[in-house]
């Protein structure tokens, strides 16, 4: 159940972060409220994941890494963000870091 809460938290965080552009600097009410509500739900789900037994370091590493990778992908595909070697390398390093944390946790 902890992983379900975590992956729901990641999904909601990615949606909320994607909405940031549409808030236009928090000047548009509806997208701003949706974005803020999304972040509130995200942190609630993350807390539920941790309270259901997931270790905090693993939960946060997965949440931030998967969320970051998803946001970069969405930005490149849908928000006209340019692809660069630095972005690809950065996301790859994040993924390697999360795998390393999970492997270290298994031993």
Swiss-Prot record:
Pfam families: Multi_Drug_Res. GO terms for cellular component: plasma membrane. The chain crosses the membrane at residues 2-19, 29-51, 58-77, 82-104. Its main location: membrane. GO terms for biological process: response to antibiotic. SUPFAM superfamilies: Multidrug resistance efflux transporter EmrE. One of its GO terms (molecular function) is transmembrane transporter activity. InterPro entries: Small_drug/metabolite_transptr (IPR000390), Small_multidrug_res (IPR045324). Keywords: Antibiotic resistance, Cell membrane, Membrane, Transmembrane, Transmembrane helix, Transport. It is found in: Cell membrane. The keyword Oxidoreductase does not apply. It is a multi-pass membrane protein. Multidrug efflux pump. Confers resistance to tetraphenylphosphonium (TPP), erythromycin, ethidium bromide, acriflavine, safranin O and pyronin Y. Belongs to the drug/metabolite transporter (DMT) superfamily. Small multidrug resistance (SMR) (TC 2.A.7.1) family. Mmr subfamily. This is Multidrug resistance protein mmr. It comes from Mycobacterium leprae (strain TN).
């Amino acid at each position: 159940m902890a992983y379900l809460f975590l992956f729901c938290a990641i999904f909601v965080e990615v949606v909320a972060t994607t909405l940031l552009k549409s808030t236009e600097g928090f000047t548009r009410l509806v997208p701003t409220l949706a974005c803020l509500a999304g972040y509130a739900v995200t942190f609630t789900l993350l807390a539920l994941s941790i309270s259901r037994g997931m270790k905090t370091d693993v939960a946060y590493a997965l949440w931030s890494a998967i969320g970051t990778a998803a946001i970069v992908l969405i930005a490149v595909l849908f928000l006209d963000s340019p692809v660069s070697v630095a972005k690809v390398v950065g996301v790859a390093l994040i993924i390697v870091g999360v795998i390393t944390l999970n492997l270290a946790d298994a031993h």
